[in-house]
Amino acid sequence: MTNLEQFYLTEQHQLFRKTLRDFLDKEVVPFVDQWEIDQQVPKEIFLKFGEMGFFGLTQEEKYGGSNLDFWYDVIFIEEVSKSNSGGFGASISAHPYLSLSHLKHEASEALKEKYLPKAISGEWHGALA
């Protein structure tokens, strides 16, 4: 058991880690090499991540998020990093942690209401320019 697990993570965190790991092993790992060749992550995988709630872990519930603590984000990044693809990890992590985090902290209420629900669901993809 690591210090992180011993001192900070609850049973709910561990259950989330297992759920995410099982999801990645089924929906990502078998296909990630082809995605690297194609230089593209299929839109369907973003929708699946959205359906599982992975894009809204620390987002407010009123936008479709789960309003969970920071440790869920840490677990998400750790597990995605184990998927043997830097391209996939960067692509799937940029959406919630680069684009959506800016909306969460900087956008007006009107912009949050317009963009966050569809972005959290995986229907829309965020980007930085």
Question: What residue ranges belong to the model's regions?
Answer:
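A non-catalytic, amphipathic alpha-helix used as a structural packing/dimerization or gating element
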Residues: 12-26
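Intrinsic disorder at enzyme termini
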Residues: 1-12
